[in-house]
């Protein structure tokens, strides 16, 4: 095992790193001299097992486990043992990483055992190809692949997914079609004269060679290679400016060609271990095209080795899933994690109500609806979450895909959030996480700009490779999805070189800044589509509205009337919308969800923490280090965005209160908060001058441009609000003391909750839950409820009132709702006379799971 290709490659990386430190090395199967040595061994070495046992650790078990330990007898000998070739890679690269980031060699060698065990089976990174202008240079660059894949292996990702065909949401209005329908850009298929007339044979062959180079490079490093084929349309609609087209294919030969093409591709690239398919209508194939997909699956099965089939969950129905399972190949379902965005590190308790109910067949409404008959009809709840796929008896794997709609450009890195995602990736026995990397969708839909992938106008800030800017984020996500409880040295060692004595401040600043936009995303979700909602460079949605509508905005999947105050949270079970919160205030019926004012308070706190940390970095000696300068700029922008959204949320609450009560003081507060928000956005725009004026993630104005472009709409909304302040009707209220209502509701009960979650439940039997309520406000508690639901996003939450005496409350969840088909999620709502809170909540760092999951007890079933 120690001589396997991945282990040998890793040993070469260690030798190279030692060589850069000026240390000469040699390799031998045995060595009896007294020089310092690293012994690399698999679990079958009895001598190594005996030595490890004497250090107090066992031989690693599992393909990806490893141990590093000093030899108990020979002080200059370090043992690296892996449970499999991949574990050996991680152990050896851990040594290399410690040496790279150390100032001296000796302290980099661990003097006490280091043990690694994976928490998730799949830790994947998805990189999109969606621009011939911006993506062909890295795709054709062997040096890029060598550096990038080495980084992924070092950070303990175990899968790389090259994603093709996601450049458009639908095959209409196509300009940049390079690798969109990928097969003819990569190979010829015997028996078919399918070709791209604008593509030379040499370039086609080069594309295939690079695909093989990348996939073989993954195998050499112990990485799985996943190929995403997201589009199977071959004729672009209304696309006169398409730079590449497909010839030689007809509807009757479409499915057979795709079958034979995917089989040929897998034969030509034997290191491809899995294929991802987008099944829903945006693939260019109408939903319910069962014969088409069963034919394509046969091509995967025909390649002669067990290649996995990964099915994107949106629009996936039982028959298509069954056809994939019938191949006998490993099948994975990959739902969206937080729609097409990034939220806090937990799975949304509930999806938006808009996507939950089953609808009538929409096929007759339009051509687009015909393509989307399942995801817009019988199974809309599969669009933006785990849907109904978390069945306890599932014969497939689940890997959650974290999309990049929230933050695409600015640097990101928060250890607590990354660790939270590492835990959430295993929800209810799920297999892991696929992370869409930063810069996802850059240059999409024909908007690529030569040499413009990183977006810097200040060229001194450009990294060597585009991913270099985000290396710290890769480190966090990779290592903390491998082990969410990893020690902090795993990431802190990488900061010392650039930040020196201010490394701790830099870590704290970016951690706080990195929680801002995910919180905005879940609390105020103007659109589930990344093609419309981009909070990083937000297209303003107005607070002020009139009888004849509002100012224009792109958020067509938000509730009507479409204004800022009516927008739904992405998790409406945990967060209150602005308008809903105002109704709760006026009705005196708070329900304990996180209010927009609480969100604003958190955003302000995170912004303040970001600024405090980055100011400590700034007061250090002036530096030309590009990483430090990039962090300073981006953290400052993120802090300003936090203050903008805090002000906007506060303004919206007070404006909705004014509209409901007529109170002038509420309107004045709304104006003041929106003015503060405008100033914060202006600050972000000024600090973002290091970026080019047109940052392109799509052709529409909402997907390109710069922060400064968004200011006029923000100022127009502020002016509309000031105009309202001048209206005579605004001077009179209805007598409601609005400020007192807000103050009472925001004084959440201060209680101590004690609860021991059950180890499981018996399907069909009542599940008794108990909770203790103590603390400062325990005497004011008017009641406790439990909110629960089987973990199927198509279902609504149920409420059960708890009975209590002397601070102890109990309730029985009815067995009729606990069938055992799904795990069950629940949380508690504690109420006083005019306020409420939820338990367990998101916690002080906003990174905890706000509900408890209980699964059926194995081997037990009620009558």
Question: Language model features by range: what are they?
Answer:
Residues 26-57:
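Short, well-ordered secondary-structure micro-motifs within conserved domains or adaptor modules
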Residues 693, 697-744:
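C-terminal non-catalytic interaction modules
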């Amino acid at each position: 095992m120690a001589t396997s290709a991945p282990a040998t490659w890793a040993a070469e990386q260690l030798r190279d790193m030692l060589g850069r430190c000026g240390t000469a090395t040699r390799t031998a199967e045995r060595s009896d001299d007294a020089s310092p040595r690293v012994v690399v061994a698999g679990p079958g070495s009895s001598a190594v097992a005996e030595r490890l046992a004497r250090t107090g650790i066992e031989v690693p078990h599992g393909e990806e486990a490893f141990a590093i330990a000093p030899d108990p007898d020979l002080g200059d000998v370090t043992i690296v043992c892996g449970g499999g070739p991949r574990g050996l890679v991680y152990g050896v690269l851990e040594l290399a990483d410690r040496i790279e980031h150390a100032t001296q060699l000796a302290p980099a060698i661990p003097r006490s055992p280091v043990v690694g065990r994976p928490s998730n089976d799949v830790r994947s990174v998805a990189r999109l190809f969606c621009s011939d202008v911006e993506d062909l240079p890295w795709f054709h660059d062997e040096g890029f692949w060598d550096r990038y894949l080495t980084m992924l292996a070092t950070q303990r990702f175990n899968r790389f997914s090259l994603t093709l065909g996601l450049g458009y949401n639908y095959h209409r209005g196509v300009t940049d079609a390079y690798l969109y329908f990928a097969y003819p850009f990569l190979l010829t298929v015997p028996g078919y004269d399918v070709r791209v007339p604008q593509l030379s044979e040499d370039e086609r062959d080069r594309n295939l060679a690079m695909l093989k180079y990348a996939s073989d490079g993954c195998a050499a490093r112990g990485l799985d290679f996943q190929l995403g084929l997201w589009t199977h349309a071959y004729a672009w609609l209304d696309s006169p400016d398409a730079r590449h087209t497909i010839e030689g294919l007809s509807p009757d030969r479409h499915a057979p060609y795709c079958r034979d093409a995917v089989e040929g591709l897998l034969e030509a690239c034997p290191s491809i271990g899995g294929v991802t398919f987008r099944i829903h209508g945006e693939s260019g194939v109408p939903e319910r095209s069962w014969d088409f997909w069963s034919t394509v699956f046969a091509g995967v099965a025909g390649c002669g080795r067990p290649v996995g089939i990964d099915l994107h969950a949106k629009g996936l129905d039982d028959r298509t899933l069954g056809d994939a399972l019938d191949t006998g190949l490993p099948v994975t379902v990959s739902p969206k994690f937080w729609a097409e965005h990034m939220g806090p590190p937990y799975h949304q308790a509930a999806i938006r109500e808009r996507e939950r109910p089953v609808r009538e067949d929409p096929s007759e409404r339009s051509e687009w609806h015909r393509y989307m008959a399942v995801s817009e009809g019988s199974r809309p709840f599969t669009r933006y979450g785990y849907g109904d796929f978390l069945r306890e008896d599932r014969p497939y794997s689940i890997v959650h895909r974290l999309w990049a709609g929230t933050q695409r450009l600015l640097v990101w890195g928060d250890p607590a959030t990354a660790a939270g995602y590492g835990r959430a990736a295993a929800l209810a026995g799920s297999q892991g996480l696929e992370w869409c990397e930063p810069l996802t969708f850059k240059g999409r839909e024909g908007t690529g700009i030569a040499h413009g992938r990183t977006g810097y106008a200040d060229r001194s800030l450009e990294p060597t490779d585009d991913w270099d800017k985000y290396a710290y984020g890769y480190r966090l996500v990779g290592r903390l999805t491998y082990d969410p409880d990893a020690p902090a040295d795993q990431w802190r060692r990488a900061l010392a070189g650039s930040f020196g004595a201010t490394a701790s401040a830099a870590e704290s600043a970016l951690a706080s800044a990195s929680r801002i936009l995910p919180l905005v995303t879940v609390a105020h979700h103007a659109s589930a589509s990344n093609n419309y909602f981009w909070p990083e460079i937000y297209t303003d949605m107005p607070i002020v509205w009139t009888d004849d509508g509002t100012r224009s905005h792109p958020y067509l999947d938000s509730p009507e009337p479409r204004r800022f105050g009516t927008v739904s949270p992405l998790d409406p079970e945990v967060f209150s919308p602005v308008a809903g919160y105002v109704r709760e205030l006026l009705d005196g019926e708070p329900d304990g969800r996180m209010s927009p004012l609480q969100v604003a308070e958190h955003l302000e706190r995170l912004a303040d923490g970001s600024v405090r940390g980055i100011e400590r970095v700034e007061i250090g000696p002036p530096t030309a280090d590009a990483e430090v300068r990039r962090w300073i700029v981006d953290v400052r922008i993120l802090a300003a965005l936090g203050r903008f959204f805090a002000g906007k949320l506060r303004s919206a609450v007070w404006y909705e209160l004014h509209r409901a009560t007529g109170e002038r003081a509420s309107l004045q507060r709304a104006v003041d908060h929106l003015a503060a928000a405008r100033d914060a956005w202006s600050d972000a725009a000024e600090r973002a001058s290091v970026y080019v004026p047109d940052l392109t993630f799509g052709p529409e104005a909402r997907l390109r441009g710069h922060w400064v472009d968004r200011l006029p709409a923000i100022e127009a909304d502020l002016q509309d609000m000031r105009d309202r302040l001048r209206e005579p009707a605004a001077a009179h209220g209805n007598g409601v003391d609005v400020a007192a209502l807000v103050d009472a509701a925001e004084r959440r009960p201060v209680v101590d909750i004690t609860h021991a979650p059950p180890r499981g439940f018996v399907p069909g039997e009542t599940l008794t839950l108990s909770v203790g309520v103590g603390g400062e406000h325990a005497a004011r508690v008017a009641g406790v409820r439990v909110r629960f639901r089987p973990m199927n996003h198509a279902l609504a939450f149920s409420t059960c009132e708890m009975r209590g005496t002397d601070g102890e409350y109990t309730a029985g969840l009815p067995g009729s709702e606990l069938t055992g088909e799904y795990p069950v999620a629940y949380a508690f709502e504690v109420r006083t006379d005019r306020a409420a809170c939820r338990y367990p909540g998101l916690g002080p760092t906003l990174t905890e799971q706000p509900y408890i999951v209980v699964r059926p007890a194995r081997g037990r079933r009620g009558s």
